[in-house]
Amino acid sequence: MKNITILGATGSIGTQTLDVIRKGNEELKLVAISANKSYKKVIEIIKEFKPKYAVLMEENAFKIVEDFCVDSKIDTKVLKGMEGMIYISTLEEINTVVTSVVGMIGLVPTIKAIESGKDIALANKETLVVAGELVISKAKEHNVNILPVDSEHGAIFQCLRGNKKEEVKNIIVTASGGPFRGKKKEELIDVKPEHALKHPKWNMGRKISIDSATLMNKGLEVIEAHFLFGVDYENIKVVVHPQSIVHSMVEYKDGSVIAQMATPDMKLPIQYALNYPNRKESQIEPLDFYKISNLTFEKPDMDTFLPLKLAYEAGKKGGVMPAILNGANEVAVDLFLKGKIEFLQIGDLLQECMNKFYKSMEATLENVISVDKEVREYLGKKYDI
């Protein structure tokens, strides 16, 4: 029996993780959850799974859920805020913490969970992007597994198993290309949020959908891959693969390329991470090669999709530069969704902040949090948010 905490239980990954646990043949037990303010969803989760703990970040949502548990005589203990997230991430009985919250908010609870010896099923890209060196070193120190919960890194993880790191030539990260694959800059001038949110293959949250449209999502994954697998940026390639059947590949020095293929369904990497090192009966539709008919691969357009190019630059620069990139992107995506900037301005803001805020300093937790705050305050004042 594995005891699970889910940080971000009401989002896209969190919801699919619940589905995996639901069908987990009683080998997976949900002990604790966190959410921002989706109290209705939290109450439904409490009714079904009866977790010992539930954490809400927003005050009003916390009170509503707490009152529900008291009135319903349910034993779930309701906690609030970052302190609550850290508490449920470090519980002695927990085996694995699923970090599926979006953004920098996942960083501190993840580090605390690692320090408490918990395996991390990592769906929060920002944690490794802004503090990858710190996270990986702590994971090694505490003998903790960092298990990637996304299709690309989950695929790479599987393609590397049983092989020697020194035999790897390139890691090849596949990208669907998002809703604007094949478009040129001039065709993206009038893009609205509703257009960018329509992903052709994956059902995702709003922030990650915009990141997919700008290819920033793939840029963040490149930085993640660098830290997760210890591979230089020159040896991490991005290939656009619109069918989303090949989830990523590893090229070895002898010319062999090992690919992981499956029906595009996030439940597979979630199930693999939660049950690692074992494989369980599939919860997804089997791959039918007769229906696929063809698989295509293209080179990404880094001039049109500037954020991908900037992610490579930020990763190579190192230090706090990935934190600057990430902080600026989180704010820029929010500004775009609120109609305060145009789609193509997202990349421009990233470039502006990278030029303005870069300092040659180590990516310690304190430095990362400090520079992230500077970037957010600057953009907040600039756009009056």
Swiss-Prot record:
Gene3D superfamilies: 1.10.1740.10, NAD(P)-binding Rossmann-like Domain (3.40.50.720). It catalyses: 2-C-methyl-D-erythritol 4-phosphate + NADP(+) = 1-deoxy-D-xylulose 5-phosphate + NADPH + H(+). Coiled coil: none annotated. 1-deoxy-D-xylulose 5-phosphate binds at residues 125, 151-152, 176, 199, 212, 217-218, 221. Mn(2+) binds at residues 150, 152, 221. NADPH binds at residues 10-13, 37, 124, 126, 205. Pathway: Isoprenoid biosynthesis; isopentenyl diphosphate biosynthesis via DXP pathway; isopentenyl diphosphate from 1-deoxy-D-xylulose 5-phosphate: step 1/6. Its cofactor is Mg(2+); Mn(2+). GO terms for biological process: isopentenyl diphosphate biosynthetic process, methylerythritol 4-phosphate pathway involved in terpenoid biosynthetic process. Keywords: Isoprene biosynthesis, Manganese, Metal-binding, NADP, Oxidoreductase. Its EC number is 1.1.1.267. It comes from the Bacteria. Belongs to the DXR family. Catalyzes the NADPH-dependent rearrangement and reduction of 1-deoxy-D-xylulose-5-phosphate (DXP) to 2-C-methyl-D-erythritol 4-phosphate (MEP). This is 1-deoxy-D-xylulose 5-phosphate reductoisomerase. It comes from Clostridium botulinum (strain Loch Maree / Type A3).
